[in-house]
């Protein structure tokens, strides 16, 4: 053919040194090294050289990233712009081209570093350089790729997007394969591998989505529209979909050796007619219907062409196709006649199966548009000759139907290798010929006979060959026969061809395979499928059952087929073939009819290859065995945390049931045993947070705002969330006491756990001293990579089998011996030393978690308190010294406490008439109660300074006296018949005339301010006629005039207390005002007093009836005679009561009402009258 002078006309693939320029839509694209040429070369490279290493890296440089410049990148954009009639704005265009150029420059540096490292792989400097170059390349691609997804330009940028993401996947594969040899840690390598597997799906779905969007956009009703539609479909199949279909092969753990793929999709050159793209209106749908529907791949054997004549013009009127199944198994089959069986000339049979098949057609078109329309004068649009050229390394002569022409199929489907003659470097071969026809010779205005040439990629081999040294992927459309009920359906775009579908159990298909390896070679079978149901796959060879396994559903019913819908699964049992030519059968069983099962391909993997499921099993076995101190699993290693055991359990649970069910069960039992051992050595009660505050004397105690949450993608078991607080004196807290009976003498213990995230989390261990750390752990919210979107299972449960970051013991946070905690770590540990054991004293160890800031928060779980090691040497001497200092301090504290307690008890007893503490002395006033309360609060170490809800050494005696103070307040409130007499509730219960205010003065003190002489405040009070009452008022007068508090009945019986600024008054000693909350009436008191402690105690759930546990509160660094102050102690009683300022006067009078109602009125004559409190209570009988 190459010697034929007619063929050697100056067309693009014969004159590459002088390429033609095609003009389409006003744009110029040089043919030769076009986007299609580059993409075809890349596809050939990916199909033949898909092995990681310098060869692959440098191959990408030669094909694209070291070859393509700005003009070629612009051609990628122009190609799609023309097809969809959309121009990319200049800014977006320049940005994309600049970024591609930057990636090209950076990748060339990366490739050179890779080449140098591969030549000297142990050189530390070159390993370091590779780590640097990988990080730079990965970061650049991560940043650049979003720029190729610009809003409104997703379709025009699609082909350069695919080039960029293909480069990204190749770089991620490099680090997955070579990262350890570059010196990267395993956690980083696994993280990047997880990125790789996730992005394969992400990039695939994006490309297919926007391909379909663009394809829909160019559809139209006429032949011109169909030409554009077909061109878009053909060219973007070559530049986008073919490349995308090979993305899964980048998964280096699933495809660790050379993998052979095949593209079975077909593309179509335009109907070979002159003026076809503009002459036939409303014909697009009929033209599309001329293309074969989805089908099994077959081998084109021959074309029998029939010739007709009209008005003396001879043309191709029809043809019949003879074909064979893949593997040439079985007899040939004949397709129905396309067109008409003309007899104007002898039929001509074109043999297609010579050499490597027909790779090129050169057609001659004929078009006649007569001046007179009528019988024998119709418009004629036909093909009057075609040359069929054969692919071959030698120069096979072409087959010619009538004559050759200039319409060259290579113009639409170029070769994949331009460095050799087209007969060797071709990319596609002719797979089928159909026909679009219209009109009859005796009636129609037009006669159209347009052969439609279908082409298949040359990677789709005539046979299903299985060698020994590679993974062989065989699309199931290469089957010989379909099972009854199986159909071929259109592929989703990323499978490289159509797929098979079944909706009921039964045989899927059979295919003939040819084994070129020794028959002793063993293989495993893998299946890439999608299914709406769980099912069982069966395989057999030559009728002999091989494998059977259960597999799970991958998608929901009615869902679209996406990359994530497909799963590649395999059988563990290897097999070998008995014959060099065998029939492989695949069936699907054990599912209900009406579900959908889709099969893309099967894979034959040499049994020696370790793939992902085996890798997972090996990794899980190593992780499980590493938990124990010995192979017989007697004990756990000390550094194995409870959290790590949970993560290993997840690793085991995620193993494939189909691949290693027995091994999975065995490993699961070992992990459960490890978990039980972990629970046994953990001295904490309820470490899994079944409840908080469930039992008063054991387990976890905590503030009411703490929540327990179920396991998620970070924690396998329950964990707690601690929020922030608005007042540091009312912190969020969680605590537990380790009983003395659980501890061993002179031993170090360790508290440890896992923190998902925290801010201002304070952790304490308290015995002789307080060990304390504040831990800030920035959280990602998940162990899953931030960009991972599928960490939720199909039922909403955490998907712990999704790619995640692995536990790394080197990142553990260790806070030993006062060292500062590594706050970036999620793991924490804090230790404490225990001296001698005294069960009567029951010091134990307090474990406390606390947050006292508004922005604070924490999520933590897997808490453990366990024995670490016996104390020896310096550590033993240190704990004995601390213990002695603590005992000395305790003895001194006991002496001081005895003195303070005696004084406080005497003050408290003096308030009451008897030891029953049910009645106040007649002269007991509020100041006396405050004074007694103040003395009670001088008792030290009633509560731990670290957390005021935990009782200290003197909690018992403090709570004894404090309870009596509460009783005194309650009795005092109960005998005051004036409601809201201290104005703590504003003006509630008072009648007001004119303008008055209630102001807060001197911290926690509310006073009534009467600023005007016309203002008046009054209250009606019910009393017992004939009984005596005392009216007591504490007030202050500013300026001239008098302030008056009057008591009277309806008629007469009036008395008053007057206050003046100019008269020397005796100030009531140490008089203060209570901060009680006012209770509506006497009956509601029920003898119970509510002080400012009320809110505090309710918040912390204190129960003073429970015997107090003692715990030391002395820090090792603070063994002094001074007391450690708790800054929040003032909120626990007397601290809320401040003395009255100078000038306040307390006055009282006796009053004997004659009726059951009296009125209390407050007013003034001039200046300002300030009233602190008004009391009216019965005299004692």
Swiss-Prot record:
Give any GO molecular function from the UniProt entry: signaling receptor binding
Keyword line: Sporulation, Toxin, Virulence
Source species, domain of life: Bacteria
Q: Spell out the note in the miscellaneous section.
A: Toxic segment of the protein is located in the N-terminus.
Function, please?
Answer: Promotes colloidosmotic lysis by binding to the midgut epithelial cells of many lepidopteran larvae.
Question: Can you tell me which family this protein belongs to?
Answer: Belongs to the delta endotoxin family.
Designated name of the protein: Pesticidal crystal protein Cry1Ae
Source species: Bacillus thuringiensis subsp. alesti
Source species taxonomy = Bacteria, Bacillati, Bacillota, Bacilli, Bacillales
């Amino acid at each position: 053919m190459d010697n034929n002078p007619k063929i050697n006309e100056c067309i693009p693939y014969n004159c590459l040194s002088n390429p033609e320029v095609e003009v389409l839509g006003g744009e110029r694209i040089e043919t030769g090294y076009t986007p299609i040429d580059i993409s075809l070369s890349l596809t050939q490279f990916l199909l033949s050289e898909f092995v990681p290493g310098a060869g692959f890296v440098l191959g990408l440089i030669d094909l694209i990233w070291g070859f393509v410049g700005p003009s070629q990148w612009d051609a990628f954009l122009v190609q799609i712009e023309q097809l969809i009639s959309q121009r990319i704005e200049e800014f977006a265009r320049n940005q994309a081209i600049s970024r591609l150029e930057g990636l090209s420059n950076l990748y060339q540096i990366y490739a050179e570093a890779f080449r140098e490292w591969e030549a000297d792989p142990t050189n530390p400097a070159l390993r370091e350089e590779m780590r640097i170059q990988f990080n730079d390349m990965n970061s650049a691609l991560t940043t650049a790729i979003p720029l190729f997804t610009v809003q409104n330009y997703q379709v025009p940028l699609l082909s350069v997007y695919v080039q960029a993401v293909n480069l990204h996947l190749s770089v991620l594969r490099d680090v997955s394969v070579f990262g350890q040899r570059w010196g990267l840690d395993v956690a980083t390598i696994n993280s990047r591998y997880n990125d790789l597997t996730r992005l394969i799906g992400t990039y695939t779905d994006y490309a297919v989505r926007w391909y379909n969007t663009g394809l829909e956009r160019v559809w139209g009703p006429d032949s011109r529209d169909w030409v554009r539609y077909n061109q878009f479909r053909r060219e973007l199949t070559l530049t986008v979909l073919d490349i995308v279909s090979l993305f899964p092969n980048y998964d280096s753990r699933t495809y660790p050796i050379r993998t052979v793929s095949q593209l079975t999709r077909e593309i179509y050159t335009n109907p070979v007619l002159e003026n076809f793209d503009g002459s036939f209106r409303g014909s697009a749908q009929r033209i599309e219907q001329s293309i074969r529907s989805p089908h099994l791949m077959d081998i084109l054997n021959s074309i029998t062409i029939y010739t007709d004549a009209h008005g003396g013009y001879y043309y191709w009127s029809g043809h019949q196709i003879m074909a064979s199944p893949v593997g040439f198994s079985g007899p040939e089959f004949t397709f129905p006649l396309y067109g008409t069986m003309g007899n104007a000339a002898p039929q001509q049979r074109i043999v297609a199966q010579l050499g490597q098949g027909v790779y090129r057609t050169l057609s001659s078109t004929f078009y006649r548009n007569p001046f007179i329309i009528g019988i024998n004068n119709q418009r004629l649009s036909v093909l009057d000759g075609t040359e069929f050229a054969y692919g071959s390394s030698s120069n096979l002569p072409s087959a010619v139907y009538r004559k050759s022409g200039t319409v060259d199929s290579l113009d639409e489907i170029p070769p994949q290798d331009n460095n050799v003659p087209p007969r060797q470097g071709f990319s596609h071969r002719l797979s089928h010929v159909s026909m679009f026809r219209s009109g009859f010779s005796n009636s129609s205005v037009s006669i159209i006979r347009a052969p439609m040439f279908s082409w298949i990629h040359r990677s789709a081999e005539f046979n299903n060959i299985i060698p020994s040294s590679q993974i062989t992927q065989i699309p199931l459309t290469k089957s010989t026969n379909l099972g009854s009920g199986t159909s071929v359906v259109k592929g989703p775009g990323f499978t490289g061809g159509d797929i098979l579908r079944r909706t009921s159990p039964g045989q899927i298909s059979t295919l003939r395979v040819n084994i070129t390896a020794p028959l002793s070679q063993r293989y495993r079978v893998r299946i890439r499928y999608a299914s709406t149901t769980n099912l069982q796959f069966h395989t057999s060879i030559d009728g002999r059952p091989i494998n059977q396994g259960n597999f799970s559903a991958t998608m929901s019913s009615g869902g679209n087929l996406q990359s994530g819908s497909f799963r590649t699964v395999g059988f563990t049992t290897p097999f070998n073939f008995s014959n060099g030519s065998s029939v492989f059968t695949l069936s699907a069983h054990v599912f209900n009819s009406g579900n959908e099962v889709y099969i893309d391909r099967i894979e034959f993997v040499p049994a020696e290859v370790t793939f992902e499921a085996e890798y997972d099993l090996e990794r899980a076995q190593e992780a499980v065995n590493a938990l124990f101190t010995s192979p017989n699993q007697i004990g756990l290693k000390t550094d194995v945390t409870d959290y790590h055991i949970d993560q290993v359990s997840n690793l085991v649970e995620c193993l494939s049931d189909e691949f290693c069910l027995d091994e999975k069960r065995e490993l699961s039992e070992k992990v459960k045993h490890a978990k039980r051992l972990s629970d046994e050595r953990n001295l904490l009660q309820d470490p899994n947070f079944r409840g908080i505050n469930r039992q008063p004397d054991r387990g976890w105690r905590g503030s009411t705002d703490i929540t327990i949450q179920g396991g998620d993608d970070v924690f396998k078991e329950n964990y707690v969330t601690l929020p922030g607080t608005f007042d540091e004196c009312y912190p969020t807290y969680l605590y537990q006491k380790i009983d003395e009976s659980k501890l061993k003498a002179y031993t170090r213990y360790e508290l440890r756990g896992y923190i998902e995230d925290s801010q201002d989390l304070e952790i304490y261990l308290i015995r002789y001293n307080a060990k304390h750390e504040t831990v800030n752990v920035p959280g990602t919210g998940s162990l899953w990579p931030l960009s991972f979107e599928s960490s939720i299972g199909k039922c909403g449960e955490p998907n712990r089998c999704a790619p995640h970051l692995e536990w790394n013991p080197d990142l553990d946070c260790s806070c030993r011996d006062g060292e500062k905690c590594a706050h970036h770590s999620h793991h924490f540990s804090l230790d404490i030393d225990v001296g001698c054991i005294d069960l009567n004293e029951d010091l134990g160890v307090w474990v406390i978690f606390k947050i006292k800031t508004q922005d604070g928060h924490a999520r933590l779980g897997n808490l453990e308190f366990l024995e670490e090691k016996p104390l020896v040497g310096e550590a033993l001497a240190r704990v004995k010294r601390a213990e002695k200092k603590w005992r000395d301090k305790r003895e001194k504290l006991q002496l001081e406490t005895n003195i303070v307690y005696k004084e406080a008890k005497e003050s408290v007893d003096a308030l009451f008439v008897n030891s029953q503490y049910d009645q106040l002395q007649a002269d007991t006033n509020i100041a006396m109660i405050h004074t007694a309360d103040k003395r009670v609060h001088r008792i030290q170490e009633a509560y731990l300074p670290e957390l005021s809800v935990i009782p200290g050494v003197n909690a018992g005696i403090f709570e004894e006296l404090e309870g009596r103070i509460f009783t005194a307040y309650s009795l005092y409130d109960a005998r005051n018949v004036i409601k809201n007499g201290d104005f703590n509730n504003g003006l509630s219960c008072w009648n007001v005339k004119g303008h008055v205010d209630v102001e807060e003065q001197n911290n926690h003190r509310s006073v009534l301010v009467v600023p005007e002489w016309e203002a008046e405040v009054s209250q009606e009070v019910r009393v017992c006629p004939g009984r005596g009452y005392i009216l007591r008022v504490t007030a202050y007068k500013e300026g001239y005039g008098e302030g008056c508090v009057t008591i009277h009945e309806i008629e007469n019986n009036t008395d008053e207390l007057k206050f003046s600024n100019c008269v020397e008054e005796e100030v009531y000693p140490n008089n203060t005002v209570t901060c009680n909350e006012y209770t509506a009436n006497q009956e509601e008191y029920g003898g119970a007093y509510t002080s400012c402690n009320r809110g505090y105690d309710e918040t912390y759930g204190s129960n003073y009836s429970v015997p107090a546990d003692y715990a030391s509160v002395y820090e090792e660094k603070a063994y002094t005679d001074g007391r450690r102050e708790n800054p929040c102690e003032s909120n626990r009683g007397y601290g809320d009561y401040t003395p009255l300022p100078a000038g306040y006067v307390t006055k009282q009078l006796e009053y004997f009402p004659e009726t059951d109602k009296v009125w209390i009125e407050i007013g003034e004559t001039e200046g300002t009258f300030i009233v602190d409190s008004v009391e009216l209570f019965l005299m004692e009988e």
